[in-house]
Amino acid sequence: MAVTKELLQMDLYALLGIEEKAADKEVKKAYRQKALSCHPDKNPDNPRAAELFHQLSQALEVLTDAAARAAYDKVRKAKKQAAERTQRLDENRKKVKLDLEARERQAQAHGSEEEEESRSATTLEQEIARLREEGSRQLEEQQRLIQEQIRQDREQRLRGRTENTEGKGTPKLKLKWKCKKEDESQGGYSRDVLLRLLQKYGEVLNLVLSRKKAGNAIVEFATVRAAELAVRNEVGLADNPLKVSWLEGQPQSTVDPGPPGLSKGSVLSERDFESLVMMRMRQAAERQQLIAQMQQEDEGRPT
């Protein structure tokens, strides 16, 4: 950590958003949360992301080492006390204070506040140098955990896309519940209620409630995994259970392996890419056709 003067100007506790007496566990947790949000890999368009990430790393190194933290707290306390004293003084008293401190510095070779702060700063610099020589295992571990979490997030997004591209279309489920036609509450299942029940399993692309046939709806999920979880677990309201069944996109019990040209880590050819685009366009058209068909059937059904 090369820039000690800049470090002394920073409030490391405020930087991490923690209390001064926070334990090491709280310091590390705050570091992970802050570092994840400003990691350069996740903020390529932010020129200050790398600088802020470096400052957070410095704060972690100092605040998780007992000796370095004690030295930093001493400097911070001295600066805080000096700032509080200065704030209480008006302009005239500030001048008197400065004159008095000048005379005290001339009369005393040791013991002044400036010398105490200087000694504390020197101690802090020595502790930082020691940390740099020994290598901060804690910092390396926290940064490794951040990289691992970023990797897992990236893999999860890729898995969601793969589920959609490998299947015949986005998964759709049929929802049924008891509801009388004249029931304005729709049996307790408004659009907002259904979304709240279903979105916990994954992204919902579409939700269509039948206008003619009460107690019926179709939901379209972004991934097969989300649809599977909804079919397997959702029971709806206790006083009016919800029946969830497959309408389209139910996965096979066994899945055939993909063609060699589309193995993991390979790059799609131009023809493969065009086929994938056409498939997604067909899926969108089929989805709109299904919704229109359901609405048409509802309108044609006698009331």
UniProtKB/Swiss-Prot annotation:
Function: May negatively affect PAX8-induced thyroglobulin/TG transcription.
Keyword Lipid biosynthesis listed: no
Lineage: Eukaryota, Metazoa, Chordata, Craniata, Vertebrata
An MF annotation (GO) of this entry: RNA binding
Biased composition (Basic and acidic residues): 150-166
Residue(s) carrying N6-methyllysine: 264
Top-level taxonomic group: Eukaryota
Keyword DNA damage: no
First and last residue of the signal peptide: none
Pfam families: DnaJ, RRM_1
Organism: Mus musculus (Mouse)
Xref: Gene3D superfamilies: 3.30.70.330, DnaJ domain (1.10.287.110)
InterPro entries in the cross-refs: DnaJ_domain, DNAJC17_RRM, J_dom_sf, Nucleotide-bd_a/b_plait_sf, Pre-mRNA-splicing_ERAD, RBD_domain_sf, RRM_dom
Name used for this protein in its record: DnaJ homolog subfamily C member 17
Sorted UniProt keywords: Chaperone, Cytoplasm, Methylation, Nucleus, Phosphoprotein, RNA-binding, Transcription, Transcription regulation
Residue numbers bearing the Phosphoserine modification: 112
GO cellular component: cytoplasm; nucleus
Positions of the UniProt region annotated as Disordered: 104-123, 150-170
